[in-house]
Amino acid sequence: MRVLVLALTVALVAGNQVSYAPEFAPGKTYEYKYEGYILGGLPEEGLAKAGVKIQSKVLIGAAGPDSYILKLEDPVISGYSGIWPKEVFHPATKLTSALSAQLLTPVKFEYANGVIGKVFAPPGISTNVLNVFRGLLNMFQMNIKKTQNVYDLQETGVKGVCKTHYILHEDSKADRLHLTKTTDLNHCTDSIHMDVGMAGYTEKCAECMARGKTLSGAISVNYIMKPSASGTLILEATATELLQYSPVNIVNGAVQMEAKQTVTFVDIRKTPLEPLKADYIPRGSLKYELGTEFLQTPIQLLRITNVEAQIVESLNNLVSLNMGHAHEDSPLKFIELIQLLRVAKYESIEALWSQFKTKIDHRHWLLSSIPAIGTHVALKFIKEKIVAGEVTAAEAAQAIMSSTHLVKADLEAIKLQEGLAVTPNIRENAGLRELVMLGFGIMVHKYCVENPSCPSELVRPVHDIIAKALEKRDNDELSLALKVLGNAGHPSSLKPIMKLLPGFGSSASELELRVHIDATLALRKIGKREPKMIQDVALQLFMDRTLDPELRMVAVVVLFDTKLPMGLITTLAQSLLKEPNLQVLSFVYSYMKAFTKTTTPDHSTVAAACNVAIRILSPRFERLSYRYSRAFHYDHYHNPWMLGAAASAFYINDAATVLPKNIMAKARVYLSGVSVDVLEFGARAEGVQEALLKARDVPESADRLTKMKQALKALTEWRANPSRQPLGSLYVKVLGQDVAFANIDKEMVEKIIEFATGPEIRTRGKKALDALLSGYSMKYSKPMSAIEVRHIFPTSLGLPMELSLYTAAVTAASVEVQATISPPLPEDFHPAHLLKSDISMKASVTPSVSLHTYGVMGVNSPFIQASVLSRAKDHAALPKKMEARLDIVKGYFSYQFLPVEGVKTIASARLETVAIARDVEGLAAAKVTPVVPYEPIVSKNATLNLSQMSYYLNDSISASSELLPFSLQRQTGKNKIPKPIVKKMCATTYTYGIEGCVDIWSRNATFLRNTPIYAIIGNHSLLVNVTPAAGPSIERIEIEVQFGEQAAEKILKEVYLNEEEEVLEDKNVLMKLKKILSPGLKNSTKASSSSSGSSRSSRSRSSSSSSSSSSSSSSRSSSSSSRSSSSLRRNSKMLDLADPLNITSKRSSSSSSSSSSSSSSSSSSSSSSKTKWQLHERNFTKDHIHQHSVSKERLNSKSSASSFESIYNKITYLSNIVSPVVTVLVRAIRADHKNQGYQIAVYYDKLTTRVQIIVANLTEDDNWRICSDSMMLSHHKVMTRVTWGIGCKQYNTTIVAETGRVEKEPAVRVKLAWARLPTYIRDYARRVSRYISRVAEDNGVNRTKVASKPKEIKLTVAVANETSLNVTLNTPKNTFFKLGWVLPFYLPINNTAAELQAFQGRWMDQVTYMLTKSAAAECTVVEDTVVTFNNRKYKTETPHSCHQVLAQDCTSEIKFIVLLKRDQTAERNEISIKIENIDVDMYPKDNAVVVKVNGVEIPLTNLPYQHPTGNIQIRQREEGISLHAPSHGLQEVFLSLNKVQVKVVDWMRGQTCGLCGKADGEVRQEYSTPNERVSRNATSFAHSWVLPAKSCRDASECYMQLESVKLEKQISLEGEESKCYSVEPVWRCLPGCAPVRTTSVTVGLPCVSLDSNLNRSDSLSSIYQKSVDVSETAESHLACRCTPQCA
């Protein structure tokens, strides 16, 4: 019994241990049938697809424990390109034969429990073929768990290690085991792929990918297995891989790749499978092995037999095809050359260079192609050629820049770039060294993006450079090194950078501010990898309020680049509530405000945090003017398409000046789930404005500075600010990397000026002129590999899949120039000789460009390609032949365009999407199928004359669009391809014999789905053709200009007018109209209808050759006349083509009643603002009228128009009495020598001050022309009449400009009136009117619905004051007005006009003066009230008889000092100005202001006074005296009996000090004392700027001095008895003097212990540096009386 129980137990345990893992029994061979294929294209049927199929028998047998052999039998490789599913796969017989040796070779693999381990193969099997074996073996990879039926795990496969989901189901009835394995390709921990191109420049946008995807894929495998005791047998396995890709979100349609594999069990052979007798070496695991995929471009498949010979052939083809003209296929040939160079060995490239380096064209193409190789081989070649000196500096710069961006970053490339930087040829050229160094940083960054754990040793050489430069205090070297570290963005660089930042490095304070800013900006890229580390540093910089505001604002830019969390943004907001610097406050607030509206996904959390922060802050911060720093950010993101763009701009100022100190701007693009900083630039200027405007000829006099400093010596602890050194810097970033920068200082500017004025530039100019005279020709071509973006990854079949974008271009130009000069120039000629010569030049220029762009998705292996390819080919060529002649002495200029034969298409653009299948053994049999099948259609054309384009262009476009109406698209069946869109638009100018046509042909897949990707896929073309127009042959187009007396000789068509005949014709028309119209109508009405009728008939003159067109024209004319007549009956307003303004005066009495009634009806709804403009308008008084006596005002109100009419009627055309002063001919020279074109003649009559311009058509019997008559009726009025049409009678406008007065202020009024205008001008005017209305409302311009004259526009501009205008614009339906429109400059009127007399004859100085005056900062003192430069008002009690510093230059230059003294007896202010080497005193005396220069009084009769240098002027203004010295920083100092006014120029802002403040806009830091401490009250601040007396015998009678006062009582501070002294000294009488007047002031007191030895005799400097412990009230003396015995 026990034996039976034991047997049952053993059997039960054995039954539970059945293995589900596949097992292959030793000694047997398992035969399977394998088939796998890949198809790519759009998912819909009826479109073309491309694919590859692999079929074979598969034999598997055991080779040992856990070791197996796999062998293929009868493999077949097929390709597919055709309409799916109609076409079939076509076997690639030659390719199969070529690969059969490798495919039939068995491979070994480890296999245990369903998991494949290592793979072994002989060396003869290439990596590409072995990957195919891996794709097959992947079908047998399975991790089966006995205890679970549903589970997830990270499984190794061909594509790497990805998340895999298992479902196991056992069918006990059928004795089958069903397994489903699904692999999510979007969640791989170790994905096998290769990225080429933009990988180092883009940033992944995780938030964007959460909203949509551009690439998605999954693999599903179904197994049917038969379980057994020894293991399961795989009966069938089916795998399906689906991959979708779209650059604009796969939800909106995508190109897909579908791969399917099937393995079907066939039989078990009893014989074992034997391996080859060869060395089986380990070849990796089941993971796909990347090999030569980078070398193979998917655009074309090359069969390479002799790479050197093929390179030579390709190079010769490129050179020959692009000799001065870019061939259409050149970009593709260029890509072919690059592919061949990638395959070639380094020695072969060296041999090619040696062969072609002396041939300029071949050399040029080689140097442009080698960087595109994309490996360190290119860098090695470039380095060796630079070291050997075989390339020029320009060639080296081009090669370095190209290779930096195109070469794939690896350790070898980084070492080569590092070594290149230290080569002598590079170190000696500063520009090349900068390029190499910046490129080194870019290379490190690209490497670290692909290898996040890159070592810090990569950037250690730059760290060493920083250490050495810091020891030498070499700011330029530090700036370069910081930009390199900024490009690299390695976290290990944080410590070296921090050493250069104030507050972190001990030596940082000795460095220039620009170094601090560069160091801060270098943190930006590090912050994208380590945001927390950078946030700590940048926040500390911002919080340190002792640092320069510019540095703090740059730190904020760095902070926001790290995508701040809510907590930090709230911290910033709380800090701003107590921020004393308004520049910083304005910048941060505006940056936060801008981010509240962001729509980009990656900044959504920042936007939410900024919305909270803005609520914390006060909205009044937004009211700060644009003189304060600002940050701007605008963006837009379209979620459905995953497309977006963002732009940021930073305007950084430091003293509220007009010109900012720093400007930065950046543009970012979002595409396909990544973002890239496309372009960034910055410009920084410090002291540039000052360097341009301040006096340059002021001698650096030691005596002057000594005198200035002596006056300020008494100021307690006064500290001079450092003078600004003129410095400018520029930088440019492309794709987020610094590529170029420049620091511009005085030395560089001097070098540029020296070069521009030196003999070398003259020598070069002479050589260029000699080359032109001897004949110059050049044929130039330049290839560019602009974009190569590739994403390579394996498919489940083991074939490489590629998504790529290529752009290549070739530009070319052919130039031939021949010049002649008569008479010939002497050898030592001066450039002025050219102005006296007759210069002729012939030139032929042919610029051309060819651009190819390819987008590829599909299989790309060295032996077979099957892909969907979109290729765009753009080509443009614009050949020109021209001749020019210039004779300045004779005033003659001509320019001729000569026809170019054989050129029709000047521009073309084609885009097609095709399915391609080809293999390397059968390239001739490659099959290319359009994805959208082609279906021919007859095109419909619409040809237009250029003269009709403005009327009919829109109609023609819409008509041609009807070829494929929208409804037809919707009605098209699912499988029926709609007809293509075909359009042809032409414009013809018969005058010059040119016809231009645009042909459009388009067919796409939007009939299936209307999304962007479907719209792109198809065939599209656009052609721009220029051909000779039908008609007479044109030899050339010529432009001639003749000035002077010979202008009459160039007149080809005399313009005459038979006035009697014209008048007679008008009378006949009037008689006919008189019978039709009512008797009440006046003659002017008849004239208007007549004009309208003649206008209509003249419009059809061009078709008058045929009787039908003539009759239709007559009918149109008749109907037009009748319509005009009927409309005139309804409207009593009168028209006259002669002069609309004159008619207005004729009918003024008759229209007065209607205008008054209309104004009364509208007055009930008028507002107060309306009353303002009406008053402003009615007060306009003409200066022209004031020339006449008052008694004749009514008579002369029409004198201007009447005089114009009388002169015009007397002499219609000035050609009858004067010769033209200028003649311009723009004509086509016909073969039959008939005139064709236009003639412009300008006449001037001095007697009547009349200018007439006549534009006439040169065609015989064509009377169309434009006539413009301008006449100066007086010094205050100018009138212009412009008429055009046949005989200048169809259309009429009149413009009158006149000066006048509005409430005694100067004004200008311009009127535009018309009688009749063309339809297109009226339409355009309506659009302009709507635009003006919209813009006016947005800019605070008032608008009233007040009707004006129906055919008149009037603009009135009146002076409100020297800096503002009152503007009124009257239109027929609205009136716009703006009162007090502020100007950015002073008008040259009143006081400004008088001040400009000092610059008489120097208009540039006058303009500069008006601009600087408007930007000046102003300070005013009235009695004891001061209004500072920053517009802050305070009252002060001034010590008697003491001078105070009102304003001064606080730099070490001390360009000026303005002292103020209060005469307490007379209660008036006196000022003393120390400027340059003179002292100017101004003081009131006997109700007048007296001025002394160096102690000598200047009588008022001798004013204005001009200093000998010409930079200082003293003049009388109103009731006072003013001094002007803008080039010294003082715009104006003015003193009257009751007011003192000081104005400093804009570039002095932030550099002044004194009672008026710093003029820096910082009102929160207004009370700045001489030692730069901010006082707590105005009194202490004012007293700090008083100059104390030296002794009680001082002539100034200021018997006081500053003292630090000890607190009279002892206090307990922090538990210790202390004595306190004032840190803000107060005024006390000198020893021996007693106070007679005092005041109380609040002072801050630092305290020391009672044991301290500090007493009054000790130096007070240590006290002034201490912080304030307590505040107390102290007594300050204002007036003292001294005893005779005082010292």
Swiss-Prot record:
GO biological process: any one? cellular response to estrogen stimulus
* Molecular functions per Gene Ontology: lipid transporter activity; nutrient reservoir activity
Tell me which positions the record assigns to the signal sequence. Answer: 1-15
> From which residue to which does any coiled coil extend?
none
Identify the glycosylated residues. 941, 945, 954, 1004, 1019, 1083, 1142, 1179, 1257, 1292, 1342, 1361, 1366, 1390, 1577, 1655
Name of a matching Pfam family: Vit_b-sht_shell
How is the protein modified post-translationally, according to the record?
A: Phosvitin, an egg yolk storage protein, is one of the most highly phosphorylated (10%) proteins in nature.
PROSITE patterns cross-referenced by the UniProt entry: VITELLOGENIN, VWFD
Describe how expression is induced or repressed: By steroids (estrogen). Expression of VTG II is lower than that of VTG I.
Residue ranges with Low complexity bias: 1088-1127, 1148-1169
Q: Provide the free-text tissue specificity comment from this protein's UniProt record.
A: Produced by the liver, secreted into the blood and then sequestered by receptor mediated endocytosis into growing oocytes, where it is generally cleaved, giving rise to the respective yolk components lipovitellins and phosvitin.
**Vitellogenin domain ranges (all copies):** 24-663
Q: What are the entry keywords?
A: Disulfide bond, Glycoprotein, Phosphoprotein, Signal, Storage protein
Region of interest called Disordered, as start-end residue ranges on this chain: 1081-1174
Please name every pair of cysteines joined by a disulfide bond in this record.
C1419-C1556, C1442-C1592
Q: Which residues form the VWFD domain?
A: 1417-1593
What does it do? Precursor of the egg-yolk proteins that are sources of nutrients during early development of oviparous organisms.
Q: Which PANTHER family match?
A: VITELLOGENIN-RELATED (PTHR23345:SF9)
This protein is called Vitellogenin-2
Native source species: Fundulus heteroclitus (Killifish)
